[in-house]
């Protein structure tokens, strides 16, 4: 009963993994390289015949690293054919182009609020034909996977936000802004740009020896909004 994930997952993945460890599962946490990437080779080293699940995020919310999910899925299929593959695509949905069928993952999770729809709504792609037990029993909603009255306003809003998005144009615009920001930031003495930041919508930086809150206050006075930490990494 072996599971593989990464040390840089969202707590929505890390905390359940810790719970599983407490019940007897063995969990391997892959470590990122200096740019925040998890490589296929590192995953291959961790795969075992008794591996039953691999969960790797598509895009890291802090470094902007984009993981090679499709290649990882292929590696899992070869080395551990009985294992399921899940990817947290919350930061990748409509930010990094992908098609579920080409990606090959068994499960893909996304969230509405990342594309300006209402909080509290999301979606789980389940590969057709994949037999999964019910998460909640009851009225049989959501194809018997998750019983309970659906949040129809949230679902409709999520659908409308998807329909109203021009992903190709948005990605190009965000990538242009990211590159411009990195170009200008690189000219500041002492500033360190962190990670590969391959995602079009994320820029991570550090200004050693300066208090982050003071920097944020200055930026906000000019209408620029930033964060000095993320609640996703707090204990």
What are these regions (language model features)?
Residues 32-93:
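Active-site phosphate-binding strand-loop segment of PLP-dependent enzymes
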Residues 94, 101-160:
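Active-site PLP attachment segment
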Residues 10-17, 40, 69, 118, ...:
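A general structural signal for well-ordered alpha-helical segments in protein cores
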Residues 16-20, 46, 68-79, 99, ...:
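Alpha-helical structural signal in soluble globular domains
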Residues 230-235:
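Conserved small/polar residues in nucleotide/adenosyl-binding loops
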Residues 1-14, 26-31, 219:
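Conserved PLP-anchoring active-site segment centered on the Schiff-base-forming lysine
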Residues 166-218:
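Conserved PLP-dependent catalytic core of the aminotransferase class-I/II
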């Amino acid at each position: 009963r072996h599971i593989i994930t990464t040390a840089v997952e969202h707590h929505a993945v890390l905390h359940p993994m810790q719970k599983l460890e407490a019940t007897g599962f063995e969990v391997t946490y892959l470590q990122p390289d200096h740019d925040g990437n998890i490589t296929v080779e590192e995953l291959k080293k961790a795969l075992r015949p008794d591996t039953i699940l691999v969960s790797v995020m598509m895009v890291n919310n802090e470094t902007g690293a984009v993981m090679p999910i499709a290649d990882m899925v292929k590696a899992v299929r070869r080395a551990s054919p009985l294992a399921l593959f899940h990817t947290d695509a919350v930061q990748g949905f409509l930010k990094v182009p992908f098609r579920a069928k080409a990606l090959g993952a068994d499960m893909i999770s996304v969230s509405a609020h990342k594309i300006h729809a209402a909080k509290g709504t999301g979606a789980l792609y389940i590969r057709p034909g994949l037999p999964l037990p019910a998460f909640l029993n009851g009225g049989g909603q959501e194809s018997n996977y998750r019983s309970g009255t659906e949040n129809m306003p949230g679902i409709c809003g999520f659908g409308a936000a998807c329909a109203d998005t021009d992903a190709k144009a948005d990605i190009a615009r965000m990538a242009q802004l990211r590159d411009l920001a990195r170009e200008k930031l690189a000219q500041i003495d002492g500033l360190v740009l962190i990670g590969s930041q391959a995602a079009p919508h994320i820029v991570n930086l550090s200004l050693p020896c300066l208090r982050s809150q003071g920097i944020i206050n200055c930026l906000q006075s000019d209408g620029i909004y930033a964060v000095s930490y993320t609640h996703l990494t707090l204990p």
